[in-house]
UniProtKB/Swiss-Prot annotation:
Example of a GO cellular component annotation carried by this entry: respiratory chain complex IV
GO biological process per UniProt: mitochondrial electron transport, cytochrome c to oxygen; respiratory chain complex IV assembly
Keywords recorded for this protein, A-Z: Membrane, Mitochondrion, Mitochondrion inner membrane, Translocase, Transmembrane, Transmembrane helix
Function text: Component of the cytochrome c oxidase, the last enzyme in the mitochondrial electron transport chain which drives oxidative phosphorylation. The respiratory chain contains 3 multisubunit complexes succinate dehydrogenase (complex II, CII), ubiquinol-cytochrome c oxidoreductase (cytochrome b-c1 complex, complex III, CIII) and cytochrome c oxidase (complex IV, CIV), that cooperate to transfer electrons derived from NADH and succinate to molecular oxygen, creating an electrochemical gradient over the inner membrane that drives transmembrane transport and the ATP synthase.
Keyword Cell inner membrane annotated: no
Gene giving rise to this polypeptide: MT-CO3
Name assigned to this protein: Cytochrome c oxidase subunit 3
InterPro entries registered for this protein in UniProt: Cyt_c/ubiquinol_Oxase_su3, Cyt_c_oxase_su3_dom, Cyt_c_oxidase-like_su3, Cyt_c_oxidase_su3-like_sf, Cyt_c_oxidase_su3_a-hlx
Protein source organism: Canis lupus familiaris (Dog)
Length: 261
């Protein structure tokens, strides 16, 4: 057995990046098949393989960081840089959606009736479900901060309570968003308004689901005493991600729901 003379984690060969990439390919291809041929077989296969990859990859990272001690301070620093870069890349993703929305809405073409929202589109009332969704996400931002402070103070019980509240609010937001989609009078195929609305809000909704999953994993880990006030980057990354989701929603609400209506 050899002993390394540095603090970096030399990761063992792993199949999960490959299976994750393949599952992403299956899901995106399956989404196209669902849209055009009304077949969900490929999408279901991709989603299932993605869930299996997530479970096993998360399991490996938890084992390496929590039980084997590979996540030294210098490794955690690298992970922090990685998470920051990931969130920055997500910012540019949403910047593209906002660009598409404002490009179309600030100078509506004659094809749109020369107005915004386009002729024939009945926008959602920003003071109804969208405002409730805003309140729900802002409240979840408060509860995730409460969870972080409780963890730093060593109060495990309060941290679990705050995490549970945050997860519940995230699930509630997703259900409200689904009900809102069900009640809209327009679809994703109704011109540029429908496509930008559903793409931007739907992509954000996907991020809420991902963030809720992230927080559920943190909740389950804390049930097994995985986090301490000194060793908790998994939770910290989830909290950063959740705050990012909150901020994006505020921009979506002001731009698409309030100003755009």
């Amino acid at each position: 057995m050899t002993h390394q003379t540095h603090a970096y984690h030399m990761v063992n060969p792993s199949p999960w990046p490959l299976t994750g990439a393949l599952s992403a390919l299956l899901m995106t291809s399956g989404l196209i098949m669902w849209f055009h041929y009304n077949s969900m077989a490929l999408l279901t296969l991709g989603f299932t393989t993605n869930l299996l990859t997530m479970y096993q990859w998360w399991r490996d990272v938890i084992r390496e960081g929590t039980f084997q001690g590979h996540h030294t301070p210098i490794v955690q620093k690298g992970l922090r840089y990685g998470m920051v870069l990931f969130i920055v890349s997500e910012v540019f993703f949403f910047a593209g959606f906002f660009w598409a929305f404002y490009h179309s809405s600030l100078a509506p073409t004659p094809e749109l009736g020369g107005c915004w929202p386009p002729t024939g589109i009945i926008p959602l009332n920003p003071l109804e479900v969208p405002l409730l969704n805003t309140s729900v996400l802002l409240a979840s931002g408060v509860s995730i901060t409460w969870a972080h402070h409780s963890l730093m103070e060593g109060n495990r019980k309060h941290m679990l309570q705050a995490l549970f509240i945050t997860i519940s609010l995230g699930v509630y937001f997703t259900l409200l968003q689904a009900s809102e989609y069900y009640e809209t009078s327009f679809t994703i195929s109704d011109g540029v308004y429908g496509s930008t609305f559903f793409m931007a809000t739907g992509f954000h909704g996907l991020h809420v689901i991902i963030g809720s999953t992230f927080l559920i994993v943190c909740f389950l880990r804390q049930l097994y005493y995985h986090f301490t006030s000194n060793h908790h980057f998994g939770f910290e990354a989830a909290a950063w991600y959740w705050h990012f989701v909150d901020v994006v929603w505020l921009f979506l609400y002001v731009s698409i729901y309030w100003w755009g209506s």
